[in-house]
């Protein structure tokens, strides 16, 4: 299978800017994006699952990932570009794709450093609703954000996957297949 499509997977802890980055790439490059949260809520609200928005992340990933991965394969087979963003992308995602598919997929895990979070926590809270309305953000504390990002970075290192460390400033560059910069 020869495909020129590009699939961009964006994951990371809560409040790292996954949806905002996907929206920015959509606007600049006209790549459509799939929010895994939207898929999750559609399946929950239509009663196609017994899971709830507060179900454990592991259970949600186990349920959602097989659907998302097959959507990715379909996009590649149809030579279409797609951005997929959400926290329900497993760290071992590569095992689900043959090499022909992997050649079309770029994976980015967004991680904020402890220093960045401590220095910019007010900004993190301020931009929390820049793309999606969070109904209840009271659980977003500096300690939780630090811990989730620490766990995300440790898991990325353990599984040897690409991660983008947001340390001094929030600036993320993503390369296109043609070596042009997506920003």
Each model region followed by its residue ranges:
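Phosphate-binding P-loop
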Residues: 1-5
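Hydrophobic anchor at the beta1->P-loop junction of P-loop NTPases
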Residues: 10
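The conserved Walker
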Residues: 14
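Conserved glycine(s) of the Walker
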Residues: 17
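Conserved substrate/cofactor phosphate-moiety recognition/catalytic segment
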Residues: 23-67
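Glycine-rich phosphate-binding loop used to anchor ATP phosphates in small-molecule kinases
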Residues: 59-104, 108-112
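A glycine- and Lys/Arg-enriched "phosphate-lid" helix/loop adjacent to the NTP-binding pocket
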Residues: 105-149
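Small-molecule kinase domains that catalyze NTP-dependent phosphoryl transfer to phosphate-bearing small molecules
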Residues: 130-175
